[in-house]
Design a protein with these regions (language model features):
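Conserved donor nucleotide-binding strand/loop of the catalytic core
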Residues: 38-41, 52-85
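Conserved sequence signature across two-component system core domains
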Residues: 17, 43-45, 69
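Donor nucleotide-sugar binding loop of glycosyltransferases
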Residues: 20-23, 47, 75, 101
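Hydrophobic helical membrane-anchoring modules
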Residues: 1-9, 152-154, 177-237
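A conserved acidic beta->alpha catalytic loop
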Residues: 44-53, 98
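Short, well-formed alpha-helical segments that are part of the catalytic scaffolds
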Residues: 20-33
């Protein structure tokens, strides 16, 4: 808390964006409403649907910082760019597609502020929060990948593939992201779980998943890549 009794603005929110012209401004506005947010780092990853032009023409709050990739390089590359520019003590990942509610950050940041966690995952599968009905095979695939994660790394996560990951900045400074694509999700999890010094918490979150018709980008191929990534970092020195 600051001298006025309000939560301090300590959170940097990193938003990787690719072809989200319909939702990106709404998501940025939702994030900026949070009193804990110090900055919003937006990385347009070579969008071709007009997203970049919308971002460039919009007069944003001074807390918003924009970065642009000239071509589509992938979510991992976008996060690498974003993480390299954050200034907040705590960093969170936010997709631009409205599947996740930024209000959840108020709960997720508490274990970090209380000094009991270094990393907090927002779990869509631990129960207790509203959920839009999932695509069945996505649910099965995520459940399988989470089981493999728990087995390989001796942890008890319930939602390895969640977008909502929050870190003390020092944690990110200790991780070198190698993946350019969606494999960044299992890579981050693998490297976090391998480092037994980092305390990981899970917090239940709400989730309003999109259909493919609404713009969902994850397919079964990403699941195979995620499995390979988990196995690779289990044995990699």
């Amino acid at each position: 808390m600051n001298d006025d009794g309000k939560p301090e603005r300590t959170l940097s929110v990193v938003i990787p964006v690719y072809n989200e012209r319909q939702t990106v401004l709404q998501m940025i506005e939702k994030v900026l409403k949070l009193v804990i947010v110090a900055e919003v780092v937006v990385i347009d990853d070579g969008s071709t649907d007009g997203t970049r032009e919308i971002l460039e023409k919009t007069a944003f709050d001074r807390r918003v910082r924009l970065f642009f990739h000239e071509r589509n390089r992938g979510k991992g590359a976008a996060l690498r760019t974003g993480f390299g520019h954050v200034k907040g003590e705590v960093v969170a990942i936010q997709d631009a597609d409205l599947e996740y509610d930024p209000d959840e950050f108020n709960e997720m940041i508490r274990p970090i502020r209380d000094g009991v966690a270094d990393v907090v995952y927002g779990s869509r599968l631990s129960g207790g929060k509203p959920q839009r009905v999932h695509l069945f095979w996505h649910r099965v695939g995520n459940g399988f990948l989470t089981f493999v994660t728990d087995l390989l790394y001796n942890v008890t996560l319930t939602d390895m593939e969640t977008c909502y990951k929050m870190f003390r900045r020092e944690v990110l400074e200790g991780i070198r992201i190698e993946s350019d694509d969606f494999s960044v999700e299992p890579e981050l999890t693998a490297k976090i779980c391998r480092n037994k010094r980092w305390r990981v918490y899970e917090i239940p979150i709400s989730y309003y998943g999109r259909s493919f018709e609404e713009g969902k980008k994850i397919t079964w191929r990403h699941g195979i890549s995620a499995l390979w990534t988990l196995l690779k970092y289990r044995v990699k020195k």
